[in-house]
Amino acid sequence: MKKIILVSVLLLISLAATIPVLAAGPPKPGEKLFDFTLPVPAERADRNYLGISGWGKTFRVADIKANLVLIEILSMYCPFCQKEAPIVNQLYEAIEKDPAAKGKIKIIGIGAGNSAYEVEVFRKRYNVPFPVFPDPDYDIHKKCGEVRTPFFIAVRLNPDGTQEVGYAKLGGFGEIPAFLEMLKKSAGL
């Protein structure tokens, strides 16, 4: 009888541990962004771009000085991410050249399963001008539902401190001018 109770308790505990994993899915428009922290970039240019101070070891997306943050979940080993890198760089340039978007829409990358060394190699190889953060243990990747890469999430940073997902999609985003207009609209610009 004690064995049956022990096995039942262990089964319930293991089932309870899997429920949050099963419930996690990709973010959807209209939802609040899942909570996570990122390391403060060592490079001053990256800190300046994000509008965060060099103080502290970590920051949250809500700390970024912007109306909207486009997050790219990527992997340096993903051939689709490699193919998409020049297009995302062109989007970055289009944002920086657009007076309405510059400083109000920011891009960051998160390297799912990638170390700091690996994301730096990716940045150098593909001339990525925006910060890319390591996620070596897939912590952030798991929180966003273990999406395939590249996966893009546009997050509106509201004045009241809330964050709302406005766009979440696997793969490329199509034509840059149309996508930038959609981002500007989501950002309230």
Name each model-derived stretch:
Residues 73-90:
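Conserved redox-active cysteine motifs that mediate thiol-disulfide chemistry
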Residues 67-69, 74-77, 148:
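Short pre-active-site segment immediately N-terminal to redox-active cysteine/selenocysteine motifs
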Residues 1-9:
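Bacterial N-terminal signal peptides that target proteins for export
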Residues 38-69:
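A short beta-strand-turn-helix
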Residues 18-23:
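Sec/Tat signal peptide C-region and signal peptidase I cleavage site
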